A protein has these predicted regions:
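Glycine/small-residue-rich hydrophobic helix-like segments
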Residues: 175-223
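Structural recognition of alpha->loop->beta junctions
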Residues: 95-100, 140-141, 204-217, 234-249
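An N-terminally biased module of ancient metal coordination in phosphate/nucleic-acid-related enzymes
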Residues: 1-83, 92-97, 154, 159-165, ...
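Conserved, mostly hydrophobic/aromatic
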Residues: 5, 25, 37, 101, ...
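Structural preference for beta-strand elements that scaffold enzyme active sites
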Residues: 1-3, 32-34, 72-76, 99-102, ...
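Short acidic/histidine-rich active-site segments
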Residues: 38, 148, 214-230, 250-253
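Extended substrate/RNA-proximal surfaces in nucleic-acid metabolism proteins
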Residues: 47-181
């Protein structure tokens, strides 16, 4: 089992140390873990200025040495809005032996998604979100799209479940652009912890992705504490098999490798 979305105390909202996360991963049967610490370069974002790349690198080296016979450890980043301020992001990537980058949209119009959607109808909120995601995928440097339809985490209680058909053209454009740039999709199991009670992205989007020829998938728990490592990943593997996918992907130095499921 691979968990490719995790946060330690190197992220502003992480609650467990890297050592604690590794120990939990081993107990839960995770064979490979990728730490994807938050990176934001926009002042006002709660992540801004938090990540110390030198300290992060030292912790990775320490845990790789300590758990080398029990756990494969990869070094990643989750970059918020990677298409913005790309010159500011570059120093965090260059010279730091990054294995994997998740590109996510956490903010829109310089507002947190929970603030952005206030007072908006569902169609306006989701259209704005998917347009920003398209810009991110078109311009940003990433290996996978993080939690593709994340907005539903915040919008579900306000606007209910969204209809994919209302945004089908935009979603298709995002997926086609991702495939053309060799960018994969992350399946994020934290959706099971939200009111929507479904993964990010939904199965409908995964089916679209497969029909368009997409293959690259990673699966992550979005753990922010040790007790959440690996949560709901085995049933997602089963679902992927049922959808016709045969592999998930591992990354080393930004290069993907298929791993049978």
């Amino acid at each position: 089992m691979l968990d490719y979305h995790t946060h330690t105390t190197h992220s502003w909202d992480g609650m467990s140390s890297m050592d604690e996360m590794c120990q939990s991963a081993i107990v839960k049967g995770v064979s490979e873990i990728c730490f994807t610490e938050h990176l934001a370069v926009r002042e006002g974002d709660p992540c801004y200025g938090w990540l110390d790349m030198d300290a992060y690198g030292k912790d990775i080296a320490k845990c790789r040495n300590k758990f080398k016979d029990k756990l494969i450890i990869k070094k990643g980043l989750e970059i918020g809005e990677p298409h913005l301020s790309m010159n500011k992001i570059e120093p965090y990537k260059s010279g730091h032996d990054i294995d994997f980058i998740i590109g996510s949209v956490h903010n829109l119009e310089e507002e947190d998604l929970t603030v952005y959607m206030q007072g908006k109808e569902q169609i306006e909120s989701y259209t704005g979100y998917f347009r920003e995601l398209l810009a991110s995928v078109s311009q940003g440097d990433m290996d996978v799209i993080g939690h593709f339809d994340l907005l539903k985490r915040y919008a579900f209680d306000v606007n209910g479940r969204y209809r994919h058909s209302d945004y089908e053209e935009l979603i298709h454009e995002i997926l086609k652009t991702a495939i053309s740039r060799n960018i994969g999709l992350e399946i994020n199991t934290s959706g099971f912890r939200s009111s929507s009670l479904e993964i990010f992205p939904s199965q409908i989007i995964l089916k679209m992705y497969k029909e368009l020829g997409g293959e690259i998938l990673t699966v992550g728990s979005d753990s922010h504490s040790a007790n959440m490592i690996g949560n709901n990943i085995p049933p997602v593997y089963l679902m992927l098999k049922q959808l016709g996918f045969k592999s998930v992907f591992s990354y080393t130095q930004r290069k993907p490798s298929a791993v049978d499921i």
